[in-house]
């Protein structure tokens, strides 16, 4: 019951209350059976007086504690789900970007949705697990008062049923784990179906091959694995019922004379075993949910291990930006296919009010260098030197806050985290310059819309970066998908405006027409600097 121990640490006393209420309800249920069986032997004159009142009170206790147990478990299910979501999303937000890239979005989303929903279903099924378990225990205790020998037969039936269940349990668990791993791939494939929707509609053969082949095969594999797993659990449940009826028949028709059982004892025995069939099936049918919850918790724990939070951070010294240098920086990227790319060793320096262009062909390492510069990738060796001091690992968060960036695969927010000393007049001027004044308004730190074309969204991302007013700006091929008019605005008006404010601008670009505007050009080839000279 390691799952319950983990959950108990999360919710503490509430879980204990729900468990105790469920056990009381189950034992009350079993006590009602004992009262019913006992009432059959009472004299006619006494049957409806004291025992009737006791029966009513016991029934009320059973119902009240059942309601308490069920509602508490439902409440706890949602509480645990919300708590884990908060903890995991906070951990995702605090994990190094490199670790998040390696882990992948699909696995994280799957844990935050499907696995946490599995835990909620588990909580909903817990009342029956404890209530039925208590009913079974209470029935066995009552059975012991009737006949120890029959109790031994009952325990033998339960033990034999447990062995059959355990034989199926290991195989079923393995199938459920495999299906959960396949569902991660299935989420990726469904995302691919949406992300590549336009291209698929332009290539019907590709679409049909993907939907009818790769996607359908994975859906079928998930179905088969889950079906086999749950069928095994179903067979185990049926095996328990078969054994119960077999032992009822054995006692009634095979061992009755050998055990010298009285008719009242046989009646009580049969009633107890018939009464226990539903609880036993209920407990066994709840076990797959317990197994799924165990798998879900394992995946939650694995996600926590895969996304370790960054070490505790300290703020940077309160001083203006004076210089940034990369000294013998080296970084090796390893792809999923086993291929690697090495950037460096690199040496470069940046100063306030400087405009630097980084150029190079595809695969030369420009984007990797950009991630290193802004602190998203940690270097394997070398040092980042800020204002003459090597940057420590516990200063990374503060270092990243020096940058505003527009990446090539940028994300556009509809709000600005913090607007500095920009005036409404300046914002409106830039909106007009970017020809967005008729589509977007900016008020109270928020844009009125982000539902724009890709080029317009990129212009809005530039405006957002400008509003943050950081000392360093990184633009990763910002002008690549802009028409000549906005390229000219970017190079001839916006970059000089930022430079005049004393900002350091690092722009990855292929626009050789504007190379003369840079103070310095750094050219990369195969991860090495082949040119770094002022113009």
Identify the residue ranges that each predicted region occupies.
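An intracellular "coupling" helix at the cytosolic face of ABC transporter transmembrane type-1 domains
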Residues: 9, 97, 114-122, 175, ...
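A hydrophobic transmembrane-helix motif
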Residues: 24-37, 128-169, 225-271
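Juxtamembrane helix-loop junctions of ABC transporter transmembrane domains
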Residues: 29-37, 58-101, 105, 124, ...
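Hydrophobic alpha-helical segments in the permease module
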Residues: 54-66, 159, 237-244, 263-285
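Juxtamembrane loop-to-helix connectors within ABC transporter transmembrane domains
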Residues: 93-138
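Cytosolic ends of transmembrane helices, especially the final helix of ABC transmembrane type-1 domains
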Residues: 231, 276-313
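Helix-to-loop junction immediately C-terminal to a conserved catalytic motif
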Residues: 374
């Amino acid at each position: 019951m390691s799952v319950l121990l983990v959950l108990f640490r999360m919710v503490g006393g509430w879980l204990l209350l729900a468990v105790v209420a469920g056990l009381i309800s189950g034992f009350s249920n079993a006590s009602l059976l004992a009262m019913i069986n006992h009432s059959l032997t009472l004299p006619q004159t006494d049957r409806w007086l004291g025992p009737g009142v006791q029966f009513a009170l016991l029934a009320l206790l059973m119902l009240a504690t059942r309601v308490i147990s069920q509602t508490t478990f439902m409440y706890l299910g949602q509480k645990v789900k919300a708590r884990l979501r908060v903890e995991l999303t906070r951990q995702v937000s605090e994990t190094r970007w490199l670790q998040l890239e390696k882990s992948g979005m699909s696995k994280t989303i799957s844990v935050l949705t499907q696995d946490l929903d599995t835990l909620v279903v588990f909580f909903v099924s817990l009342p029956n697990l404890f209530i039925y378990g208590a009913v079974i225990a209470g029935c066995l205790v009552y059975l012991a008062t009737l006949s120890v020998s029959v109790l031994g037969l009952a325990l033998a039936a339960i033990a034999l049923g447990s062995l059959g269940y355990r034989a199926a349990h290991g195989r079923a668990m393995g199938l459920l784990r495999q299906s959960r791993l396949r569902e991660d791939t299935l989420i990726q494939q469904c995302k691919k179906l949406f992300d590549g929707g336009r291209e698929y509609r332009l290539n019907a053969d590709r679409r049909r091959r993907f939907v009818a082949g790769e996607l359908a095969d994975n859906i079928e594999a998930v179905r088969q694995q889950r079906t086999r797993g749950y069928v095994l659990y179903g067979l185990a449940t049926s095996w328990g019922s078969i054994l119960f009826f077999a032992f009822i028949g054995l006692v009634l028709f095979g061992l009755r004379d050998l055990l010298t059982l009285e008719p009242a004892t046989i009646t009580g025995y049969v009633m107890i075993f018939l009464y226990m069939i539903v609880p036993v099936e209920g407990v066994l049918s709840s076990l797959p949910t317990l197994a799924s919850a165990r798998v879900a918790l394992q995946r939650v724990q694995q996600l926590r291990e895969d996304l370790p939070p960054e070490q505790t951070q300290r703020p940077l010294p309160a001083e203006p930006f004076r210089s940034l240098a990369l000294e013998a920086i080296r970084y090796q990227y390893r792809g999923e296919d086993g291929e690697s790319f090495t950037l460096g060793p690199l040496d470069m320096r940046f100063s306030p009010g400087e405009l630097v262009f980084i150029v190079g062909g595809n695969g030369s390492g420009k984007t990797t260098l950009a991630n290193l510069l802004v602190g998203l990738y940690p270097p394997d060796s070398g040092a980042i030197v800020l204002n003459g001091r090597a940057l420590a690992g516990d200063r990374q968060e503060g270092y990243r806050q020096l940058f505003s960036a527009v990446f090539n695969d940028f994300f556009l927010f509809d709000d600005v985290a913090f607007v500095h000393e920009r005036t409404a007049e300046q914002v409106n001027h830039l909106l007009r310059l970017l020809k967005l004044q008729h589509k977007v308004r900016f008020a109270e730190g928020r844009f009125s819309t982000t539902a724009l074309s890709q080029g317009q969204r990129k212009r809005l991302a530039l405006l957002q970066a400008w509003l943050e007013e950081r000392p360093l700006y990184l633009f990763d091929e910002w002008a690549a998908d802009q028409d000549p008019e906005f390229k000219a605005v970017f190079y001839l008006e916006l970059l000089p405006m930022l430079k005049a404010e004393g900002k350091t601008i690092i722009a990855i670009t292929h626009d050789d027409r504007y190379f003369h505007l840079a103070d310095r050009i750094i050219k990369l080839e195969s991860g090495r600097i082949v040119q770094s000279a002022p113009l």
